[in-house]
Design a protein with these regions (language model features):
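Active-site beta->alpha N-cap acidic-glycine motif
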Residues: 1-77, 83, 166, 173, ...
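Residue-level signal for short, function-critical loop segments
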Residues: 20, 87, 150-151
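Short beta-strands and strand-loop turn motifs
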Residues: 42-44, 80-84, 111-116, 144-148
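Alpha-helical scaffold elements lining the catalytic groove of polysaccharide deacetylases
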Residues: 48-74, 87-142, 155-158
Length: 189
């Protein structure tokens, strides 16, 4: 909720990729995200590489499970998916084109990022998160910043407002990913 408070106070829209196993208990947060005009995308149901990425059908079913939960519980039709570890990850190399096409067939576009806060790796600090974002965002007209809002990523919350203010000062705008002129992809088929 604190993330949403900051986004609301700064007039910023964001895209949240949800993990299905974490939806239970976060229903009010997801409802608030939707009501405030944020976008909800599918990340995965369980976020365990060996389970979800063992083959194309297993991963497809994992994503569809979350898409169906969002539709049933929130009447929300998710149109984006973010592959855990990105679309160029080695787990899906044998079926990457197939899964991307299957997602497209049901109206799911995939999204990656071009700037990472690296806030889910090791023991991030406020300084390291800011440095990771600063070193890359200037390279893009439309930076897509990957940040995490769950788990042990409390440092991200502590710098979110500073990141927004700095980017606004540099002339950057904010919106949901589906409104970008072009999706950010690591892999193009």
């Amino acid at each position: 909720e604190k993330y949403l408070d900051i986004l609301e106070s700064e007039g910023v829209k964001a895209t949240f990729f949800v993990i299905g196993q974490q939806i239970n208990g976060e229903e009010q947060t997801i409802k608030r995200e939707i009501s405030q005009g944020h976008e909800i995308g599918v990340h995965t149901y369980c976020h365990e590489a060996d389970r979800i990425y063992c083959n194309c059908d297993t991963y497809y079913k994992d994503v569809i499970k979350v898409k169906n939960i969002l539709k049933k519980q929130f009447d929300y039709d998710a149109g984006l998916v973010r592959f855990p570890w990105g679309s160029a990850n080695t787990y899906i190399s044998s079926y990457r084109d197939n899964i991307i096409q299957r997602f497209k067939n049901i109206g799911l576009e995939y999204a990656d990022w071009n700037v990472s806060a690296e806030d889910s790796v090791g023991n991030p600090t406020q300084t390291s998160i800011m440095q990771n974002i600063r070193k890359d965002y200037v390279r893009y007209d439309e930076p897509v910043i990957l940040m995490h809002d769950s788990g042990a990523n409390k440092m991200t919350l502590s710098v979110l407002n500073n990141i927004i203010l700095e980017l606004k000062e540099k002339g950057y705008g904010f919106d949901v990913l589906s409104k970008r002129s072009k999706c950010c992809h690591f892999y193009e088929n």
